[in-house]
Structures are given as C-alpha cells and as structure tokens.
C-alpha cells in the first residue's frame, strides 16, 4: 500500500491515473450502451486507448527504475514540438499519392470507422477479426483520434501520428536513453542525453514509414519497453509486475505488425544466450545457486509466456504455421543476406557508423561489452531469419531499429564521455549529423538516406533512371492528370460496372486512381487491384468483368521487371485488343507516359480467357489454386 498511499493517506499519482482510466472505461461502456451508433464513440475509444498507452509507458519506466527529471521532461517537450513543425513542413512541401502499402492503414481506418458506425460490438469484432492478417487493425484503435478531426487525407493521417504515436514513443526512447546511460555508468549525463536522444530521434528510418502514412513505428513503443524491462534484468528474483509488462509488450508488438516477430525471436534468443553465458561465469566463480536461480526463472517465465502467447494469438500463429512465406514472398527477395547487408550499410550511413565506433571504443575501455554484443547478435539473427523470406523495405527496417538504437546510444555515451577532448569538432559533428538527418528525403524508393540538396546535386549515370522514378513518385507533378483520369472513370462507369488497370507499379497502379482525391474514394469497388506479384496475386478475372481497361505506354516497370507479371498480361492484351476492345480516351501524364482507356466491344469467350491463362503456364504449374482454379471458377459462374 505504500506505493499507493502516502503518509497523509492521499492517493498517489499512479492510483489517480488508474482511477481516471477506469472512470473513462465506465463512461465508454455507458456511451456504448446508450448511444451505440454515436459518431463520437470510436474517437473517444481511441483517445482512451492512447491515454492507457501513455500511462503504460510511464509504468514501464517506473518498473525499469528510470526517472525523468525536469530536464528530461523539458527536452522531450521541446523535441516533440520540433517534430510537429518538421512533419508539417515536410508533408506540406510535396504532392504524394498514397497507394499500395502506403494507403493500407488509411483504408483500414475508414473501414474501422464504418464498422463502429454499426455499433461497438461490430467495431471490436471487426478489429479482432483482422488479427491473423498481414495488416491488423490493432493500430487503428490508437490513430482514430486525432485523425477524426482532420480532413482525412493521406497527409493528415501521417501528421496525426505526431499526436497519437510519437508522445509515447518519445517517452520510451527517452527512458531507454537513460537506462543505457545507467548501464554504462555515464558521468556526463547532460551531453549524453542531449546527443543520444536527439541522434536516435532524428534517425531517418525511424520516421521514414510514418512520413508515408505507415504507422508501423507504433510497434517500437513496445520494442523499447521490452528493452527497458530486460536490458539490466537477470531473473535473479521473480517480479510478476515486470513479467506482465513484458508479456503485454510482446503481444502488442506482434499485433502491431507481424514481421516484428523477427525482432522478438532475435532479441529474446540473444538475451537468453547472454544470460546463460553470464550465469555460467557466475557458476565458475562459485555462485552456482544464483546462476541456477537465474536460469530456472528464465525458463519458467519463457515457457509460460510462450504458451500464453500461442493461446492469445492462435489465429495468427496458425496462419504462420500453415503458410509458406518464403515461397509466396520470393518476389520481394531480391538478393538475400548479401543485398540486405548492402541495404543496412546504405541506411546506416557513414556518420552513424562513426558514432557506433565511439560506442565500441567506450564499451571495450570500460569492459562492458554486453550491450553491443546483444545488439549485434540480435541484429544478425533477425536479419538471417528475415532474409529467408524477403529483403527489407524502408518500413521493415523498423524491426532492426532497436538494435541500432542500442548501438547509437553506446556511441553517444562514448562521444559524451570524451566531449572535453576536441569539444568543438565533436559538437560540430553532432550538429551536422542532426541537420543532415532531418533534411533527408523520405520517399518510397529511399535506400540511402540523403538530403534533397545532395540528391539534386549529384546525378550518376547508373542511377539516372532510379532518381527519375524517385522524383516522379515522391512529388507527383502529374496529380492533375491522374485526377482527371479517375474522374473520367467515375463519370463513365454505371451502376455495377467496373474498370481494370493493367499497370501495377510504383509509378502507376490502381491505388493512385482510387486515392488521388482523399477522403473521396469514388472508385472503391469499381477499380480492383491489379495483377503483378507471383505467389501473391491471383489470376485477374476482374479484367474479364471490366467494361473499361486502362493501360499505359511505355508500360511502367520500375520494380522487378524480370519477374513482374503485369507486363506479360499487357503483352497479350496488345495482341488481342483490336478484336475485343476499342479505344475511347487518352491521357498524357506529361512525363513521357500516355494512358489509354479501352472499352470492351465483344463478350468474353473461354478461348480468350485461356489465351491469357496460357501465358502463365509456368506459374500455373506452381500455383494452380491461384491461376487455373480461379479461371475455371470464373468460367463456370459465367456459363463458359
């Protein structure tokens, strides 16, 4: 009771916060019962969830033995205000159309809003029903507020994350900075915190996906919580409160994005290995009882946690066990571990590598190698596991960020502890790195994080096409033309009619037409996703249902042209179109690409369907359930 009641028998801040959250939950229950279809219910649920998350983050800090004094709190508020200004500036200086993975969460937010409009039961049922999917709706619980107050565009969804995700994330990041400082026994705490916290906060790949309306960095809140609760904990005694927080953080990070499992497996394996090694050293020093107690408690906690996790997340676990991801996602595996190492070298950058060397120097000097060893072990194990399936995109780089944060903070400690030697050059190095990091372009094709002025200043011949595509997709100068083409389809498609767009590329795909005027999405249900990725996309029977077919010249092929399927489908269409379709409209994009819209003039025949299907005989032999079975089912339904 001492933690709840003071000497004057007054409630502690923790108790007051818990009571406030409990009262809020009761209020939500009453609103849900009395006004089940109220428009404000889901936003209120979202606000309450964000408050619970922030309260939980504070409790993690308390359990981990981390205290934020006035200086830390002031720094967090100042950096958060800077982040607000940065997002506002960065999002406002570009025209980006959210498509593909970059619109998934926005679409899920709209769908969740529609589900809650039917009542609380329908809303929560819809969220839970997605827990086995690649993209769950768990994050939508936290992002609805303040997204509901915005214009509901792609940019506003990205900006809303500064208010619903970033506060808790910064709190965890600040706590982790302090915790690593404690472990390394940093003496120059002021410079260490300022350098370390600012360095990891401005790391480009921390915010890269958020700038593209992918709130996957939400999962890092729980990753950092896991680090805070385990980095200096050795299971010498059982702490049920700590165990509950570790379990909840692990479940939450997996629900955030399934590929965070690679971090979970890599980190816990590396952590257990480190604990076994340290316990073996204790046993050699004559402390066998303590060593055995550590190992026993770890195994007991691990077995119980794994069993509970399997039960809690069984829909996701069963799908993982039944699905061959390495086969179905082979399209995204562009070179295995060798290419992944290259990506990491480019994404880390020379400046960060220099900082890491400072950290390694400090850890060797102070004979505290556990942190960098743990980080490097987790990094390599997660990388080896992930590249068995695919190579990482910019958003999947987030699963490696916890390891890099440990390495960066070790480097910040090394820099701070030696700051009095060559102080001005070191401070200039830190400031230059921050300015470099905040000016990095955050685009879908970013591999090497570079500022705008560097991208515009250097034009190597072998990267000319890559830079052209990056420029076209990052800042859409052709947005008016895309909107005009989308409007043409809206005006010409009647009730129940659909169109089909053959290109499915980073440069142009159906999502660009569907989402070019958010929050309006009049083409939803009228322009389905296209056919491009082997092992993932099914044979496109939507093409045969379509009144209009949209294609482009030249056909866009910026990603994996050797294995992409859409251009082969388009080649067959070019051969047959004069006998099956007529041209009805053209749209010049102003960048060398011209779109044409073709209207079907003859009924579909079995021979036509089989002509398209035979182009993919090799794929059909490997995935008959995705090709011939789909085609035959469509033919049977249409009496062909």
Residue ranges of each PLM-predicted region?
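Start-transfer (signal-anchor) and selected internal transmembrane alpha helices
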Residues: 1-88, 293-304
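Transmembrane-helix motifs of polytopic, lipid-linked glycan transferases
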Residues: 58-59, 63, 156-187, 225, ...
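Short acidic/glycine- and proline-prone juxtamembrane loop motifs at membrane-interface regions
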Residues: 205-218, 393-394
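C-terminal luminal/periplasmic domains and tails of membrane-associated envelope-modifying transferases
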Residues: 468-501, 506, 511, 515-640
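Hydrophobic, aromatic-rich transmembrane alpha-helices
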Residues: 53-63, 172-178, 272-283, 348-372, ...
């Amino acid at each position: 009771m001492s933690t709840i009641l003071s000497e004057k028998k007054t409630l502690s801040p923790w108790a007051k916060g818990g009571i406030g959250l409990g009262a809020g939950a009761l209020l939500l229950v009453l609103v849900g019962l009395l006004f089940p279809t109220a428009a404000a219910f889901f936003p209120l649920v979202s606000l309450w969830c964000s408050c619970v998350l922030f309260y939980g983050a504070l409790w993690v800090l308390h359990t981990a033995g981390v205290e934020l004094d006035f200086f830390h709190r002031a720094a967090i508020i100042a950096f958060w205000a800077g982040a607000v200004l940065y997002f506002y500036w960065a999002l406002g200086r570009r025209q980006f159309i959210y498509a593909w993975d970059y619109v998934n969460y926005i679409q899920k937010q709209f769908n969740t809003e529609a589900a809650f409009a039917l009542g609380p039961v329908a809303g929560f049922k819809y969220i839970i029903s997605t827990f086995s999917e690649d993209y769950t709706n768990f994050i939508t619980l936290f992002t609805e507020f303040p997204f509901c107050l915005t214009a509901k565009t792609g940019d506003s969804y990205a900006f809303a994350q500064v208010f619903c995700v970033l506060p808790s994330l910064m709190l965890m990041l600040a706590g982790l900075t302090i915790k690593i400082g404690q472990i390394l026994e940093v003496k120059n705490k002021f410079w260490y915190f300022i350098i370390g916290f600012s360095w990891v906060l401005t790391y480009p790949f921390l915010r890269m996906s958020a700038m593209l309306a992918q709130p996957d960095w939400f999962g890092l809140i729980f990753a950092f919580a896991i680090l805070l609760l385990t980095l200096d904990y050795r299971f010498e005694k059982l702490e049920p409160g700590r165990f509950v927080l570790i379990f909840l953080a692990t479940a939450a990070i997996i629900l955030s994005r399934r590929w965070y499992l690679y971090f979970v497996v890599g980190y816990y394996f590396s952590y257990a290995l480190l604990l076994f090694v340290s316990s073996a050293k204790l046993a050699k020093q004559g402390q066998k009882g303590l060593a055995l107690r550590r190992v026993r408690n770890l195994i007991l906690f691990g077995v119980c946690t794994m069993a509970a996790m399997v039960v809690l997340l069984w829909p996701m676990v069963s799908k993982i066990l039944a699905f061959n991801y390495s086969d179905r996602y082979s399209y995204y595996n562009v070179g295995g571990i060798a290419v992944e190492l290259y990506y990491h070298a480019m994404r880390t950058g020379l400046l960060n590598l220099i900082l890491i060397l400072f950290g390694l120097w400090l850890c060797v000097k102070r004979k505290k190698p556990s942190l960098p060893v743990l980080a490097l072990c987790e990094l390599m194990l997660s990388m080896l596991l992930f590249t068995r399936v695919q190579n990482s995109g910019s958003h999947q780089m987030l699963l490696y960020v916890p390891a890099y944060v440990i390495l960066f903070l070790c480097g910040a400690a090394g820099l701070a502890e030696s700051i009095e030697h060559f102080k001005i050059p070191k401070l200039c190095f830190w400031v230059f790195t921050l300015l470099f990091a905040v000016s990095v372009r955050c685009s879908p094709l970013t591999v090497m994080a570079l500022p705008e002025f560097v991208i515009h200043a250097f034009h190597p011949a072998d990267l000319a096409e890559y830079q052209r595509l990056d420029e076209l997709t990052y800042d859409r100068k052709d947005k008016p033309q895309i909107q005009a083409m989308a409007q043409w389809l809206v005006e010409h498609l009647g009730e129940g009619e659909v169109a089909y767009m053959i290109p499915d590329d980073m440069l142009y795909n159906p999502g660009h037409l569907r989402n070019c005027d958010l929050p309006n999405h009049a083409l939803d249900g009228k322009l389905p996703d296209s056919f491009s990725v082997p092992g993932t996309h099914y044979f496109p029977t939507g093409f045969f249902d379509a009144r209009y077919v949209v294609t482009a010249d030249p056909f866009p092929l910026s990603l994996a042209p050797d294995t992409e399927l859409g251009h082969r489908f388009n080649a067959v269409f070019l051969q047959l179109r004069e006998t099956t379709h007529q041209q009805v409209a053209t749209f010049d994009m102003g960048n060398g690409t011209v779109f044409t819209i073709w209207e079907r003039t003859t009924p579909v025949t079995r021979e036509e369907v089989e002509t398209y299907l035979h182009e993919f005989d090799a794929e059909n032999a490997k995935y008959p359930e995705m090709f011939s079975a789909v085609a035959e089912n469509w033919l049977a339904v249409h009496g062909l």
